[in-house]
């Protein structure tokens, strides 16, 4: 879908620069370019008309098997491998507890105007040539068969860069779009967004040969569970009962919405009421059927589709009531 407006900020200085580590990781491939416009959000248009099953992708662009093994990615906390599909496209495959959460979150983030990479849930398939695997061995059989994987497309037209950003250090500080992202991360209980580790900048070539810097939360796997606070043992991912119990909004006071965000980043729990009202206007356009499609795309069981949809509807209604919209 074409989005007609974007939040674009041009800055002359870079955020801190670093490199990803770990064999096979999605390594920064392109130097940062401070002269290119910075984009965090695009107007999604008629949100109520969006298809949250395919999201930013499309059925025609979905991964197509069989898949051939490239390498194992040892970065992060979840088992991952890199593969090529039948059309020669390169994909990052993730297994285990973040698979469903990441795809569902990807659909919601995209629908509300924030930038994402193409992701798909694949129920089963075969990877040829996968030998001597480490932690991915549990999820890829000796015959190459796998079940329940998240596929993320490595788009050569929008490679990741060395530029880093956090929710406190970025070109969008003070904007309603950044405030909306704070609310959105609390809405889906994303507790692992501290620092630049899960935030990336893509260098994308767009129409007319122009280049833009796309700022996105690149790992959405620590969602739809318990934020918990404190040590990581207090947190969970993709646990419906935990998601149902988490508090969303603390209070409204002196023109500020106080979020009950209890993740690794303690500084995103206060949002100007005007910004919160703007975001509530976006989120309230999502229908129950659209939310269901997002969870179906993530491979959720029927009870999970029902439960997550109902809780999100409840949280969005709570937001609307809190901001008076």
Each model region followed by its residue ranges:
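Conserved kinase catalytic-core segment
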Residues: 101-102, 107, 160-235
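Bacterial N-terminal signal peptides that target proteins for export
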Residues: 1-8
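Conserved ATP-binding subdomain of kinase catalytic cores across diverse folds
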Residues: 56-164
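C-terminal catalytic region of ATP-dependent kinase domains
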Residues: 207-325
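Extracytoplasmic/secreted envelope proteins and their assembly/folding machinery
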Residues: 80, 102, 106, 181-184, ...
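N-terminal, Lys/Arg-enriched amphipathic/low-complexity engagement segments
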Residues: 22-67
């Amino acid at each position: 879908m074409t989005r007609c407006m974007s939040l674009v900020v041009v800055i002359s200085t870079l955020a801190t620069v670093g490199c990803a580590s770990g064999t096979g990781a999605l390594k920064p491939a392109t130097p940062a370019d401070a002269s290119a416009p910075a984009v965090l959000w695009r107007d999604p248009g008629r949100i109520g008309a969006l298809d949250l099953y395919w999201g930013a992708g499309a059925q025609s662009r979905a991964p197509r098997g069989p898949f051939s093994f490239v390498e194992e990615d040892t970065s992060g906390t979840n088992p991952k491998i890199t593969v090529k599909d039948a059309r020669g496209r390169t994909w990052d495959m993730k297994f285990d507890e973040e698979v469903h959460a990441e795809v569902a979150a990807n659909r919601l983030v995209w629908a509300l105007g924030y930038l994402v990479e193409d992701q798909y849930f694949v129920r089963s398939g075969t990877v040829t040539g996968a030998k001597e695997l480490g932690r991915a061995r549990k999820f890829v059989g000796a015959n190459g068969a796998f079940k329940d994987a998240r596929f993320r497309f490595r788009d050569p037209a929008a490679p990741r860069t060395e530029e880093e950003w956090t929710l406190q250090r970025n070109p969008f500080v003070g904007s309603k779009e950044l405030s909306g992202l704070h609310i959105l991360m609390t809405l889906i209980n994303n507790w692992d967004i501290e620092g630049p580790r899960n935030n990336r900048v893509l260098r994308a070539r767009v129409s007319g040969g122009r280049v833009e810097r796309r700022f996105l939360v690149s790992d959405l796997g620590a969602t739809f569970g318990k934020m918990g606070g404190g040590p990581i043992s207090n947190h969970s991912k993709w646990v419906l009962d935990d998601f149902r119990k988490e508090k969303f909004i603390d209070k409204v006071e002196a023109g500020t919405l106080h979020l009950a965000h209890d993740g690794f980043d303690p500084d995103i729990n206060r949002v100007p009421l005007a910004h919160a009202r703007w975001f509530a206007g976006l989120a309230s356009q999502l229908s129950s059927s659209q939310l269901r499609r997002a969870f179906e795309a993530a491979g959720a069981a029927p009870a999970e589709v029902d439960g997550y949809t109902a809780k999100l509807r409840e949280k969005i209604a709570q937001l609307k009531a809190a901001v008076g919209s």
